[in-house]
Amino acid sequence: VDAQGKPLTPGLFAGISHIGLEEISQEDSSVDANLNLKTGDTGLIETLRPEFDVTRAYNPRSTLLAVARVGGMSFTALGTDGALLSGQGGVIRLDGGYEPIAGKRVPFISIGAGKLGQSGSSRAAQFMLLEQAFNEAKAPTPGDERLLTGQGRNALNQAMASQRFLVSVNREADIRQVLKLAQKYAIRVALVGALACLA
């Protein structure tokens, strides 16, 4: 970059955030980061919605963008964490544009205690449901009970083809299971949180 003698300030990454997806976190009508379907809305397991694309609700006119830019932040990864397989996010420049960088989406998986209510109160069930979803997306069996919608299968197939997933996980035993899952399905995972790795 030739700045012709002018000072340059590097932009910082704001991490995985809800900037532009929520204004006031305690005001439900201003929070678009998570899909909160009520049980029975569709008859499908509500914790597995890989087709939910949180970038579609991104508001580049949010007042929080200006605050982030003043703090030196120039881009962020929009994330969703409302469910076990909670949907997709993407990296966004905080420059007022609407589209994720390169148009790419990254799926989010959330494992652990915070999702026990959505998975029969068992971490083992979380991994069971994820494996069933991956298998169903690869080769759905006619007449088999469906965990995913048709769009969900397509979204998960595309995600598996791109091989990138962000996984929110903290407990060491859960991290080990995530790595086994990644190896089994030949996907790459980036761990979010991973608090057990800090010990």
Residue ranges of model-derived segments:
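Short gly/pro/ser/thr-enriched loop/turn and capping motifs at secondary-structure boundaries
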Residues: 19-20, 83-86, 198
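Feature captures the catalytic cores and cofactor-binding loops of soluble hydro-lyases/lyases
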Residues: 23, 186, 199
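Short, glycine/acidic-rich beta->alpha junctions
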Residues: 56-60, 196
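Polyanionic/metal-chelating signatures
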Residues: 60-189
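Short beta->alpha linker loops
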Residues: 170, 195-196
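Catalytic core of soluble alpha/beta enzymes
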Residues: 176, 196-199
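Short internal beta-strands
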Residues: 190-194
